[in-house]
Amino acid sequence: LNKIGGSSAKTKFKKLRFLFDFALAFHYLCMSLKNYMCQKPDMKQYAKHDGSAVTKDIRPQIKLCRKEEFENLWPQINDIFDKARQYMRRNGNNVQWTNGYPQKQTVASDVADGCFYLICLNGRIVACFCIRPSPEPTYAKIYNGQWPDDEPYNVIHRLASDGSVGGIALLAIRFALDKGNLRVDTHELNSTMISILEKEGFIRCGTIYVADGTPRIAFQKQGTRH
């Protein structure tokens, strides 16, 4: 009986030891895979125009547009504005960004004031936007609502993308939020921007009127430096 009992105990011990060793090996395997994934470069396969694949860095970089480079970069910036207008028209927004807005002199003023930014990917400009500090003259009066506070704020304007990279608008908005309290306005027909702002937690505050007299929906969110 003792032999039988001892044999049974040894068998159980061997099974427990096997399970322990297996669990330990599985743990180390998971840790190795985790470390491998964390060390992997943030890369993705993109398709060239000819259909072949090329590996490129997928992390867009935000940089301030410098005065000395603006003239050379303007054709690329203006092309992005054109593509943004085309996107608006295709999606039923025929009233925003008309008459060639944003004009070159407007953007040149943004650049001169050090508040115009470029979003670049692999050396190519894919989007642009402006962040200006308060006060914004057209925000002095708000209708059918009110601003949640009277604290200093920033305003994001002239946000445009060439459409080649997803999530660019959100990237720009979060970049602006890192600088503090942020107010944004957009047309009621700009469903894409409205959706982005609402998903990001912006409060719909009321209606403001821009310089040409047309209405815009006003939004605000407190940034991380508020």
Q: PLM features: residue spans?
A:
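Conserved active-site alpha-helix within GNAT-family acetyltransferase domains
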Residues: 188-206, 214
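Conserved acetyl-CoA-binding loop-helix of GNAT-fold acetyltransferases
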Residues: 164-178, 195-199
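Conserved GNAT acetyl-CoA-binding A-motif
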Residues: 178-189
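A short beta-loop-alpha structural element at the N-terminal edge
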Residues: 58-80
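Conserved acyl-donor/pantetheine-binding loop and adjacent beta-alpha core of acyl/acetyltransferases
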Residues: 130-164
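Conserved GNAT-fold acetyl-CoA-binding loop/helix
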Residues: 85-105
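A short helix-loop-beta-strand connector motif used in the catalytic cores of GNAT acetyltransferases and
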Residues: 105-118, 135-137
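Conserved beta-hairpin
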Residues: 113-129
